[in-house]
Amino acid sequence: MQAYFDQLDRVRYEGPQSTNPLAFRHYNPDELVLGKRMEDHLRFAACYWHTFCWNGADMFGVGAFNRPWQQPGEALELAKRKADVAFEFLHKLNVPFYCFHDVDVSPEGASLKEYKNNFAQMVDVLAAKQEQSGVKLLWGTANCFTNPRYGAGAATNPDPEVFSWAATQVVTAMNATHKLGGENYVLWGGREGYETLLNTDLRQEREQIGRFMQMVVEHKHKMGFQGTLLIEPKPQEPTKHQYDYDVATVYGFLKQFGLEKEIKVNIEANHATLAGHSFHHEIATAIALGIFGSVDANRGDAQLGWDTDQFPISVEENALVMYEILKAGGFTTGGLNFDAKVRRQSTDKYDLFYGHIGAMDTMALSLKIAARMVEDGELDKRVAKRYAGWNGELGQQILKGQLSLGELAQYAEQHNLAPVHQSGHQELLENLVNRYLFDK
């Protein structure tokens, strides 16, 4: 079959001085960073949905891309053509992983039977492509938000039959992910929220989605899936309010239903923006709570109130993100999936490469800067010094529960405590970070 990207052999590392737009300047897969290959640190993935499924349509205009596999035709044959192009792209981009929703790779069909038959055929196609290319599945998921049946949600739907249909999709997608060797399974509640409280029973819906997640965990263990289950937080869009608002909200939900040891989070940068947080905040919070799993690397626009899903280009932002990840020991089953799309005006098929190459270079340079920060250890030393009192006798007695509130008040009076505020040195630390970012 003729190559779709016929003007490109493969994207390769050419170094920081290169002006070739189809080459990496900073991402060198085999370069050692803190004793580990860069590819193994970053675990890059390209997503099926934005890259191969979106046709360029938006709220105000029809599709603009004219991809060959998006033309009228027999649905399964078009899905196979899309898979051909997808794996050509993945190979030429030199990414080790990809991610998909069920209906990204397979026609949904008109019934559950058609859905399952179509998906089964496409799983066989994908398995053959993976074997041929060496590309692996980072994670799979089920799209339980696009079809009109999910207008009022999937697991939170007022109709238990819709809940059951969603369960069928999730079981099928989990089984497919397992068969394809996927390292994670993601649950994003696209419409698990509400438009108005006037017709919403919050307690009922919370109980429903809690039970749904418990069943997902039960099925994971029953099928022997060794990967990680991930919830992807998002505060709103398409609903007014979504129940997986941010990392902290998800943790509270997991604790309520006894799932905090079973499910981690897949954090998207743009979703952090929509929640009023920095990407750094969400990563650090997940690590602090012990539920960090994987990352959807992209960026939003702070001046817009919706998910723009642009490619990450800020080394300043992502160096701090990679710093947190490195300090926590790096990815295990997770990775950096580019949940990002070219702009509607970017109609050249090679724009797909330009977007991903820039993003991969951004994250690679961020990794190298973060590694310098870890090796230098200056930030850690200053934070440790700031909290040093908690390693002393008084601090340890408080943390170990050896003093009651009343005893602590008595201690303060007996010792005539008169603590004086110590500077947080924020400006000094910001200058220190800039040294790592901009000094050669």
Swiss-Prot record:
Keywords associated with the record: Carbohydrate metabolism, Cytoplasm, Isomerase, Magnesium, Metal-binding, Xylose metabolism
Cofactor note as given: Binds 2 magnesium ions per subunit.
PROSITE patterns attached to this UniProt entry: XYLOSE_ISOMERASE
Organism superkingdom: Bacteria
Single Gene Ontology BP annotation: D-xylose metabolic process
GO cellular component: cytoplasm
Catalytic reactions on record: alpha-D-xylose = alpha-D-xylulofuranose
Catalytic residues, chain numbering: 101, 104
Residues reported to bind Mg(2+) 1: 232, 268, 296, 339
Leader sequence residues: none
Main location: cytoplasm
Localisation: Cytoplasm
Protein family membership: Belongs to the xylose isomerase family.
Protein name, as recorded: Xylose isomerase
